[in-house]
Amino acid sequence: MFLAIFSLIHVLTYQVKLDDYSRDWINRKQAGVTSILAGVVDLKYLTRLFPTPDRILRDSEFLREHRLSFYGSEIGQKVGQPLATFLGNGTTTNCEGYIDKISIISDGNTIGARIEGWAVDRATNEIPKMVVFANQGTVSGIGFSGRLRPDVEALYPGYLYAGWLGHATFLSGTELEAYISVGTENALCKLIDIHGD
């Protein structure tokens, strides 16, 4: 009997760890996609998509022009479009979240960044699926939710996977904004002004 209980506990513990590993694997792949969509060359995550990132970067423009692969997705087509395309249902303040880290990947007139944080949709009490980054009224990148955040879970029980990671570009000296889609109406909620030189 003891052996059966011990085995069951071991199997359940392994399954929980496997779930965390699966989510992490997916998040790393998604981060590679956000890097390409934003035009930020983040080798740390591009290598998660393909072992030789140079090939992805070389073929990326062709894929974009012909709306192939992730460029053909609804989300992929939003990058570079006016933020107003997301504002059909207005704005709200019914969200919580924080930008934990901004890593500058490329500098110059146009800055490329990897951005990490967490967000919660208080209208539906759910974790948003993605974060939208905007610069001067244009969608300049996206991020995907699902990253493990025990610190957020401690404050907001039920939100263990409220973390997100994404990429965006912005012009030097301008502000980069982060939004999530909130509620059943999908109104945009501004998380925070995250950069201004």
Place the predicted regions along the sequence by residue.
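Signature aromatic-anchored transmembrane alpha helix within multi-pass, membrane-resident enzymes
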Residues: 2-12
